[in-house]
Amino acid sequence: MGERKGVNKYYPPDFNPEKHGSLNRYHNSHPLRERARKLSQGILIIRFEMPYNIWCDGCKNHIGMGVRYNAEKKKVGNYYTTPIYRFRMKCHLCVNYIEMQTDPANCDYVIVSGAQRKEERWDMEDNEQVLTTEHEKKQKLEMDAMFRLEHGEADRSTLKKALPTLSHIQEAQSAWKDDFALNSMLRKRFREKKKAMQEEEERDQALQAKASLAIPLVPETEDDRRLAALLKFHTLDSYEDKQKLKRTEIISRSWFPSTPGASASSSSSSKTNSVLKKLAQNRRATPTSSPVTMGHLGIVRRRSREVPESPQHVAETFKSGEPQLPEGTNQNRPVSPQDCSLETAETPKNSSALGQEESCQDRPQPPPDTSPEAPNPQDTPQPCSLGSSLVADYSGSESE
């Protein structure tokens, strides 16, 4: 750097070559500039490249081979006439300093402190590499004929052992001799494989679009093909096919039943069962504790007369509570709800209106011939269950 800057540069007027000699001495500087700042201590700063992989002892990080550092170089000794240099550098990942020095005896570098070597060395003999002949052995081969003959026999036996391996290597090299043909064959195989992959992708896309699938399909295997060959699928009938099948069944069906008697008996039995069910429901609905009488329903019978009665006589009759009944009429006989409904239907409108106005307490009294000590429980007046009394008019009947 100093020479480059000093050559063809400015020379001051007071520069004397005999006195100063060079521009560096004139400027009182070193040609290496900052690299020679510790030159008085015998230390020169150089650019050092890591010879192998190591681990830093300070940060425990890996430092690869080929990483460069600004290292302080100094001489620490000699191996015979070969100087031994030591290099001190700072780790770029921490504040730890690493020291290494040369090993001329083994043509290697040795770590002094600050790091640990990643062991990747091997024995050349174990690795079947060519070993260098030592100087003493080389001189002995040149001077001693018997030693040279023995050494030759050992070399020939080693060659016989390595011959199969060497022949295999030669065959492999000859197979790759024509690189153009190999490249053409490789590209052709690649095109065929690419075309097959494109066809398979198109089939997968068509299947996904047909089945509305959004999942990726895995490649088909031989087991899948064998399993698919064993399966059998039945197609579902459409609506039109089902309708045709129904029409065919209806057309092929017989118009007449196979056993008319059996069908008639089955229909009659079903009707009988329905009637029995209705009767059972009616029995559950009607009370069966005591018979219903005329007194329970509040119906009063009047004897029919040829001459219509006056309204005053009718009112007196209702007030006295002793209606005149025709002979042979039993007032206290039980009356069914069906009889009541028929009698009410035959009653004229005027009689029904009068009966509705009558209260439930104006019930008929028992006949005089009956003793009051033992009244009939059916003739005793009971509360009206229909809410209003009914008066039956038998004016058009045939009773005397």
Swiss-Prot record:
Q: Which residues form a coiled coil?
A: 182-214
Q: Where is this region: Disordered?
A: 1-26, 255-400
Return the GO cellular component terms, semicolon-separated. post-mRNA release spliceosomal complex; U2-type spliceosomal complex
InterPro entries (UniProt xref)? Saf4/Yju2 (IPR007590)
Specify residue ranges for compositional bias: Polar residues: 283-292, 327-341
Task: Give the compositionally biased regions (Pro residues).
Answer: 364-380
Keyword entries, A-Z:
Coiled coil, Nucleus, Phosphoprotein
- Phosphoserine: residues bearing it: S40, S310
Q: Name one GO biological process term.
A: RNA splicing
Spell out the Pfam families in the cross-references: Saf4_Yju2
Superkingdom, natural source: Eukaryota
What is the annotated localization of this protein? Answer: Nucleus
Record's keyword annotation contains Magnesium: no
By sequence similarity, the record places it as follows: Belongs to the CWC16 family.
The entry's function note states:
May be involved in mRNA splicing.
Instruction: Report what the protein is called.
Output: Probable splicing factor YJU2B
Taxonomic source organism: Bos taurus (Bovine)
The gene name on file is YJU2B
